[in-house]
Amino acid sequence: MFANVGWGEMLVLVIAGLVILGPERLPGAIRWTAGAVRQARDYITGATSQLREDLGPEFDDLREPLSELQKLRGMTPRAALTKHLLDGDDSIFTGRFDSTSSDQPGSGKPPKPQSGPGPAAASGPAATTTPASTPFDPDAT
């Protein structure tokens, strides 16, 4: 409950309590708050142990689905889709459908042939210094 309250927030609460309650009533208020938190913690622990005692082995069966729900609560939509619908295969999201040795350099994969009009055999330094043109897709317009 107070797991994400830092020292800065605690200092602000103490200073606010000092201003609101005053120095003579602040220690009593801190003692009362600590006692109330301790009583609540003891009550919750007692209720949990009472449930565990009454339910017996069924209590663990009840906790198992709750722990699975807790795991799902922290999951992103992409991770949930990957885990439950795609059995952990996230290649549809990453675009790496075949992670064989063809992705490694020097695998003997032939270069992609150039399509479209152009010089059949370009030679000399002019072929290496021409800038790469952006591909044009007439269907995209």
From Swiss-Prot:
Gene3D superfamilies: 1.20.5.3310. It comes from the Bacteria. GO terms for biological process: protein transport by the Tat complex. Keywords: Cell membrane, Membrane, Protein transport, Translocation, Transmembrane, Transmembrane helix, Transport. One of its GO terms (molecular function) is protein transmembrane transporter activity. The keyword Manganese does not apply. It is found in: Cell membrane. The chain crosses the membrane at residues 2-22. Belongs to the TatB family. HAMAP family: TatB. The Tat system comprises two distinct complexes: a TatABC complex, containing multiple copies of TatA, TatB and TatC subunits, and a separate TatA complex, containing only TatA subunits. Substrates initially bind to the TatABC complex, which probably triggers association of the separate TatA complex to form the active translocon. This is Sec-independent protein translocase protein TatB. It comes from Mycolicibacterium gilvum (strain PYR-GCK). The lineage of its organism: Bacteria, Bacillati, Actinomycetota, Actinomycetes, Mycobacteriales.
